C-alpha cells in the first residue's frame, strides 16, 4: 500500500507567490508531496485545499514567506575546501591576519603545515596588502605556513619556501607550486571533503538558498555531490557545470569534455549535470576590456569554437567565463555561430558568466541573441576599489550593468560567484538596490534596480536560466515547495536592514533544510 504524502499548512503574516510589491499576499500555503498545492487567504480555504487530510499546521506568526532563492553561479566546493583552514574573512588589519595564523598554527608539530582559507582579499585590510614572508617568519611557528588569497595567490614563510625549494621572496602565483604546497600540507580525505561540502551546503540553506548552480566540477567533485544525494543529504537542489581547466590547450579541453559523464535525467529533482564551464578571459585586473592586451584572453576565437561545439554535443549546455566586453563579444560570436549551425535549440542554455563589462552595443546583441547572462554584482561590491583602479571611472560606472541588461530585454539572472564575493543573497540584493561598495562609497549608481527586481533576479529569472522542468522560483500550485520564511517582509523596511534580515525557515521540496528554532518539529496535526 502506498503511503500518502504528508500535507503541511503553513500560516504567516504574508505569503508571497513572487516578489512583486503589487500582489496581495496570501496567509496560508498548502504543501504536499514536495509541491505547492494551494495558496489561500483563509484557514477554511486551506483546509479544503488539503482535501480533508490530517494536515500538519505550522503558524509562523509575523513571518513573510516567499520563493526560495537561487544562486546561478557559486563555488560551494571552494568554500568546502576552506572549512578546516584558518579563516581570514573577518580580518580587517594585517595584525588580524597574523593573529589568525598564529592561533591556527600554535602547538602544531614541525611537520604540520598551517594553511589559511582562500575566501578573503587584501582590500578588506586597512593596510591594503598581503602579509610579508618576514611577518610570517616572525610568528615563530614550528611548521610551514602558507597564507592563501583566492585560488591563484599565496604567501609562504621561509619554512614553506624551503620545502618548495623556491627562494623568491614575493607572493606565489604559480598554480603548480601552490598545488604542490597543498599536497605537502596533506589533502583532506574523501570522507572529510564530503562532510565539508555538506557543511557548506547547509550554510547556504541558512542564507535562504534552495537551488545553486555550481560553476565547475571534475569527476572526483561530482562524486562528492552524488554521494550526498545517494545518502539523502543534499539540502539544496544542485546544478553542476563540468569544468574545463583554465588555460587548457584545445586538445586537452576536448579530452576533458569527452571525459564528462553523460547528463542524467533533466528532471532529477536534486542533482543535474547541465553543461560545460570554460574560461575566456581573466578577472578584474586582467579582464579583456577595450585596450587590454592579448594576454587577457585565455583562448583565441579559434580555440573557443571547438570547446563550444563539443560541449553542446556532449551536454547541450555551456557557460563561458567572460568578464570584459571584448571577451563577452567573443563568446557571443561563438554562441551565435552555434545557434546558426543548429547545435542548440534553446539559446538560453548558452550562458555568459559574469559579463561585468558590457558596452551598450554588446547589450543590444545579447538581447537579440536570446542567450543567457549569469550576472554577479557581488564581485563589484567586494572589489569596488579594484574595479575603479583597473577600469577607470567611466567603465566602473557601468560595472555589472543590470539596469541596462534588463531594460534591453536580456535573459539575465543573478549569482554570487561566492565564496570570495559574498555568497549571502541578501547582501548581493542589497548591493543591487543601493550600489554601495564594500569600500569607497557608491559604484555604478546608475545601474541600481528596485528591490523587487533584485529578488526576481534571484528567483523567477534564476529558475528560467536553470531551465528546470517543474516550476521553481515562484510559489504557485504545482511548483516545487522551495521557500524561505523571513522574520519580516523583505520588500519593505529600510534597505540597510536587508543583509541582516533573519531567515527563520528554509524548505526544499517541503522538507526543512534550515530550521534553527525547530518550527516544523512543533507542527500541530489535525
Task: Please name every model-derived segment.
Residues 490-497:
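Short, Lys/Arg- and Gly-enriched loop/turn segments at beta-strand edges
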Residues 228-232, 260-271, 366-370:
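Acidic (Asp/Glu)-rich catalytic clusters
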Residues 195, 309-319, 323-350, 354-355, ...:
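His/Asp/Glu-enriched, well-ordered alpha-helical/loop segment
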Residues 205, 267, 312, 367, ...:
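Anion (oxyanion) recognition and catalysis
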Residues 75, 268-284, 371-381:
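Non-cysteine beta-strand/loop elements that form the S-adenosyl-L-methionine
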Residues 3-12, 16-17, 21-255, 274, ...:
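Divalent metal-binding segments
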Residues 248-252, 383-387, 446, 516-518:
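Short, charged, surface-exposed secondary-structure boundary motifs
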Amino acid at each position: 500500500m502506498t503511503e500518502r504524502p504528508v500535507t503541511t499548512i503553513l500560516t504567516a503574516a504574508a505569503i508571497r507567490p513572487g516578489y512583486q510589491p503589487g500582489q496581495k499576499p496570501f496567509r496560508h500555503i498548502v504543501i504536499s508531496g514536495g509541491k505547492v498545492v494551494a495558496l489561500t487567504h483563509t484557514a477554511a480555504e486551506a483546509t479544503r485545499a488539503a482535501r480533508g487530510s490530517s494536515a500538519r499546521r505550522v503558524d509562523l506568526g509575523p513571518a513573510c514567506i516567499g520563493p526560495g532563492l537561487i544562486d546561478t553561479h557559486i563555488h560551494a566546493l571552494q568554500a568546502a575546501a576552506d572549512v578546516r583552514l584558518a579563516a581570514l574573512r573577518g580580518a580587517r588589519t594585517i595584525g588580524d591576519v597574523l593573529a589568525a595564523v598564529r592561533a591556527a598554527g600554535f602547538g602544531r608539530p614541525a611537520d604540520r603545515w598551517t594553511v589559511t582559507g582562500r575566501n578573503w582579499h587584501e582590500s578588506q585590510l586597512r593596510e591594503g596588502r598581503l602579509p610579508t614572508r618576514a611577518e610570517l617568519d616572525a610568528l615563530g611557528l614550528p611548521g610551514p605556513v602558507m597564507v592563501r588569497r583566492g585560488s591563484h595567490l599565496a604567501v609562504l614563510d621561509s619554512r614553506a619556501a624551503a620545502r618548495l625549494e623556491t627562494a623568491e621572496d614575493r607572493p606565489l602565483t604559480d598554480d603548480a607550486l601552490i598545488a604542490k604546497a597543498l599536497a605537502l600540507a596533506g589533502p583532506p580525505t574523501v570522507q572529510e571533503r564530503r562532510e565539508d561540502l555538506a557543511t557548506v551546503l547547509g550554510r547556504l540553506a541558512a542564507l535562504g538558498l534552495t537551488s545553486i548552480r555550481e560553476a565547475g566540477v571534475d569527476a572526483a567533485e561530482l562524486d562528492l555531490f552524488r554521494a550526498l544525494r545517494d545518502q539523502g543529504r543534499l539540502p539544496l537542489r544542485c546544478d553542476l557545470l563540468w569544468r574545463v581547466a583554465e588555460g587548457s590547450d584545445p586538445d586537452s579541453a576536448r579530452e576533458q569534455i569527452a571525459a564528462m559523464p553523460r547528463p542524467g535525467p533533466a528532471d532529477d529533482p536534486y542533482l543535474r549535470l547541465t553543461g560545460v564551464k570554460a574560461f575566456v578571459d581573466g578577472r578584474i585586473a586582467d579582464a579583456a576590456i577595450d585596450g587590454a592586451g592579448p594576454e587577457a584572453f585565455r583562448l583565441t576565437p579559434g580555440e573557443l569554437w571547438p570547446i563550444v561545439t563539443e560541449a553542446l554535443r556532449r551536454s547541450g549546455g555551456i557557460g563561458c567565463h567572460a568578464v570584459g566586453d571584448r571577451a563577452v563579444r567573443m563568446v557571443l560570436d561563438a554562441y551565435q555561430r552555434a545557434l546558426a549551425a543548429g547545435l542548440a535549440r534553446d539559446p538560453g542554455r548558452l550562458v555568459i558568466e559574469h559579463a561585468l563589462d558590457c558596452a551598450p552595443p554588446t547589450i543590444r546583441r545579447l538581447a537579440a541573441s536570446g542567450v543567457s547572462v549569469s550576472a554577479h554584482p557581488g564581485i563589484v561590491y567586494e572589489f569596488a576599489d579594484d574595479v575603479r583602479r583597473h577600469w577607470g571611472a567611466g567603465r566602473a560606472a557601468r560595472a555589472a550593468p543590470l539596469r541596462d541588461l534588463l531594460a534591453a530585454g536580456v535573459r539575465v539572472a543573478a549569482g554570487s560567484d561566492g565564496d570570495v564575493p559574498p555568497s549571502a543573497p541578501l547582501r548581493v540584493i542589497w548591493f543591487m538596490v543601493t550600489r554601495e561598495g564594500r569600500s569607497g562609497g557608491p559604484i555604478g549608481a546608475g545601474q541600481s534596480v528596485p528591490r523587487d527586481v533584485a529578488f526576481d533576479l534571484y528567483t523567477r529569472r534564476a529558475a528560467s536560466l536553470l531551465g528546470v522542468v517543474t516550476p521553481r522560483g515562484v510559489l504557485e500550485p504545482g511548483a516545487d515547495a522551495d521557500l524561505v520564511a523571513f522574520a519580516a517582509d523583505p520588500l519593505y523596511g529600510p534597505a540597510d536592514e536587508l543583509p541582516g534580515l533573519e531567515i527563520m525557515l528554509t524548505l526544499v521540496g517541503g522538507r526543512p533544510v534550515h530550521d534553527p528554532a525547530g518550527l516544523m518539529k512543533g507542527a500541530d496535526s489535525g
